[in-house]
Amino acid sequence: MIELLINGETRAFPAPLTLAQLIESLELAGKRIAIEKNGEIVPRSQHADTPLASGDRLEIVVAVGGG
């Protein structure tokens, strides 16, 4: 298990885990999101190749349309 800090909340996930797998497990696949890992924005093209480790800090922002 790995522990991640996601939007200020500690959560545990099975290891190994990539950013793309995390997005799937959080049911965010297909949504317009931006993710920051340890202070760095991760481009969508790198989600599948970005491994996560215990202690990583993630900020996930979901874009909401409106007008």
Task: For each feature predicted by the language model, list its residue ranges.
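Ubiquitin-like/PB1-type beta-grasp interaction modules and other compact soluble beta-rich domains
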Residues: 1-66
